[in-house]
């Protein structure tokens, strides 16, 4: 396995970083370092999703430390239940986390992604969120928990599959990136995380696009704080019962109650 990043990989890394060191934020010069997020000495691969652009000083100071985040009890339980459903039972590729807004679903989802990455089950992560500001928060939390940088992409970014990195986008961007997302899921083992899943109404343009774009995803993690749809619309990936409530197996669902 090669240790050094290629020139093409370095170009992608500095593009993702916006030309700035991804630790201190200073503008990078030509002598910037293409660094392994998970150290090469600890099994880290020389791929863009495990790379970051750093100034020489920050790379030296960084050493080989990997971040650890302490989970709340419910986040730990959700992660373990999800891993058991997806990897042990393998009854279905979808897992649902139902918890109120602000409860910490993003952290729980990122910890699940890290677990799947560490176990060698996935290569890429794609996050779909409702708004740009939420997308930005995902990028920050994802890095803090996994140590991997996640780039925001829009319809204008084109061939996302060539970036070889984890990405996040709004639901509305899905239709314009449908072919690229489809290619990513066909070429790599991909976890798709759907934040505020009720935004993906089946009849809406981004709902139809998502259904096609992610049909080959290895796993789909569905986050919702609205298990019932008052408008009667159906969403992708999940079925609903006669009361318009999500109808998904209990073993494939984690629900956070107010008592928790």
Feature map (PLM): residue ranges:
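Post-DEXD/H (motif II) to motif III coupling segment of the RecA-like Helicase ATP-binding lobe
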Residues: 202-260
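Conserved pre-motif I regulatory segment
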Residues: 67-98
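Walker A/P-loop
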Residues: 90-112
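Conserved RecA-like ASCE ATPase "motif II neighborhood" in helicase/translocase motors
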Residues: 167-209
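Inter-Walker segment of RecA-like/P-loop motor cores
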Residues: 143-179
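Conserved Walker A/P-loop ATP-binding site and its immediately adjacent core
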Residues: 106-108, 121-144
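Short cysteine-rich loop/turn motifs with clustered Cys
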Residues: 4-33, 55-57
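Histidine-centered nuclease catalytic patch
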Residues: 25-53, 64-66
């Amino acid at each position: 396995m090669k240790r050094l990043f290629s020139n093409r990989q370095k170009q992608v890394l500095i593009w993702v970083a916006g030309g700035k060191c991804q630790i201190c934020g200073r503008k990078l010069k030509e002598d910037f370092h293409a660094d392994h997020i998970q150290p090469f000495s600890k099994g880290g691969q020389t791929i863009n999703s495990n790379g970051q652009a750093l100034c020489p000083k920050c790379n030296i100071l960084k050493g080989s430390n990997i971040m650890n985040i302490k989970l709340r009890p419910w986040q730990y339980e959700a992660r373990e239940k999800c891993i058991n459903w997806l990897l042990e039972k393998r009854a279905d590729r979808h897992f649902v986390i139902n918890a109120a807004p602000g409860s910490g679903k993003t952290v729980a989802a990122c910890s699940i992604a890290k677990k799947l990455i560490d176990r060698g089950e996935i290569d890429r992560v794609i996050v779909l969120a409702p708004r740009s500001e939420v997308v930005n928060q995902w990028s920050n939390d994802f890095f803090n928990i996994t140590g991997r940088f996640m780039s925001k992409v829009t319809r204008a970014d084109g061939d996302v599959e060539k970036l070889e990195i984890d990405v996040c986008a709004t639901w509305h961007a899905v239709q314009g990136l449908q072919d690229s997302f489809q290619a990513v899921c066909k070429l790599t083992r991909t976890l798709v995380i759907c934040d505020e899943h009720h935004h993906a109404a089946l009849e809406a343009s981004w709902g139809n696009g998502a259904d096609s774009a992610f049909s080959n995803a290895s796993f789909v993690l569905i986050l919702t704080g609205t298990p019932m749809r008052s408008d009667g619309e159906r969403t992708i990936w999940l079925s609903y019962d006669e009361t318009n409530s999500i109808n998904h197996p209990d073993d494939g669902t984690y629900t956070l109650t107010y008592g928790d």
